[in-house]
């Protein structure tokens, strides 16, 4: 088991969360993909396995300790590398929209999410433009 997965799995009880093995694997696969992409595009300063699990994955999941998101619709405005939106899309049962103005980041998310079987809508726009368009 990777250090990222060990850290993720050991941190879940502290949040009062239980996730399936498959969900944990998908979360870690996204973390690994983000670290790999970070080699060519500045996505994060946190790239070690434990740091990614704690500062990106577990921190993103903390909202699930406070609210049942199953069937809810969420938008992650200024999603950057996909946190907290992508982990919530993976683990919560919510329909998630990722919104960011930086096209390079969104193009990467549009590519990697389907590869990992992650269902989230990606919208490249500034928040005020997205609101005006609706």
Task: State where each predicted segment sits.
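Conserved SAM/SAH cofactor-binding pocket of Class I
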Residues: 61-134
């Amino acid at each position: 088991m990777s250090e990222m997965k060990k850290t993720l799995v050991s941190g879940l009880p502290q949040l009062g969360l239980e996730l399936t093995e498959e969900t944990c694997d998908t979360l870690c696969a996204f973390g690994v993909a983000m670290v790999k992409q970070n080699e060519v595009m500045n996505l994060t300063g946190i790239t070690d396995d434990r740091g990614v699990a704690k500062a990106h994955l577990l921190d993103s999941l903390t909202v699930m300790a406070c609210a049942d998101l199953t069937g809810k619709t969420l938008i992650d405005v200024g999603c950057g590398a996909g946190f907290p939106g992508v982990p919530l899309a993976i683990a919560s049962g919510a329909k998630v929209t990722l919104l960011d103005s930086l096209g390079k980041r969104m193009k990467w998310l549009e590519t990697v999410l389907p590869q990992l079987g992650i269902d989230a809508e990606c919208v490249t726009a500034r928040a005020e433009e997205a609101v005006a368009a609706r």
